[in-house]
Curated annotation (Swiss-Prot):
Protein name per its UniProtKB record: ATP-dependent dethiobiotin synthetase BioD
InterPro entries: DTB_synth_BioD, P-loop_NTPase
Binding site for ATP: 12-17, 54, 116-119, 176-177, 205-207
Gene coding for it: bioD
Any Pfam family hit: AAA_26
Signal peptide segment: none
Pathways involved: Cofactor biosynthesis; biotin biosynthesis; biotin from 7,8-diaminononanoate: step 1/2
């Protein structure tokens, strides 16, 4: 079983988009893959339970089926930071609870588990703990999605520096253009290639529609076939 954690430089960096495409790429190569969205806020009621749109996308993209509460064990209605939403709901999120939920995912029989984080890298799960501590404890290799927009240099470099300080195994990063009108897009991309200490896996240009899977040819070569 191969396991990966997909994080982003910020909220809306494109984590779900990338995780979904990775799941589809693995499916193309006959791999049994499942997505895991441990924490989600901004959920809505459906079928008598809170569900998250991003988690549903991961379920639709996966080749291994599982019940919703296995894919997204912590779901909250307010579109706010999960640890604040959890406190309001009277729910305590701990690393042990996350690991217990993750064991349920491992029992689904997948060859690959792709865990999508929430928000950016430094996401609190409580007043005293962060999601990245759980990622380190589980020894998950990380893929960083850089949302290409104004401010991405600072966000990406700070994230990378923190990962390195923790000894996190970041296997690479993906440039995802979220702002179609970004000034000096190529110059920013070149700056990130020069400065980030991890290899670039793929570039996803901005599109009103979901980019074709061919965009991820490099990602396919680096991830789906060689991991």
């Amino acid at each position: 079983m191969k396991e990966f954690f997909i994080t982003g430089t910020d909220t809306d960096a494109g984590k779900t988009h990338v995780t979904s495409l990775l799941l589809k790429l693995l499916a193309q190569h006959k791999k049994q893959a499942i997505g895991f969205k441990p924490l989600a806020s901004g959920c809505e009621m459906a079928f008598d339970q809170l569900v998250n749109a991003d988690a549903l996308i991961l379920m639709e993209s996966a080749t291994v089926s599982a019940k919703y509460d296995i894919i997204n064990p912590f779901a909250f209605a307010p579109a706010i930071a999960p640890h604040i939403a959890a406190e309001q709901a009277g729910v305590t999120i701990t690393a042990d609870k996350l690991s217990s939920a993750y064991k349920n995912v491992k029992q689904q029989g997948a060859d690959y588990i792709l865990t999508e984080g929430a928000g950016g890298w430094a996401l609190p799960i409580s007043n005293t703990d962060y999601l990245y501590n759980w990622v380190k404890a589980e020894q998950l290799p990380v893929i960083l999605v850089v949302g290409m927009k104004l401010g991405c240099l600072n966000h990406a470099l700070l994230t990378a520096a923190h990962m390195q300080s923790m000894g996190i195994n970041c296997i690479g990063w993906i440039a995802n253009q979220v702002d179609p009108n970004m000034d000096e897009y190529q110059a920013n991309l070149d700056s990130l290639k020069l400065r980030l200490p991890f290899p670039i896996l793929a570039i996803s240009p901005y599109s009103e529609q979901t980019p074709k899977l061919q965009i991820y040819k490099t990602l396919l070569e680096n991830f789906a076939l060689n991991t």
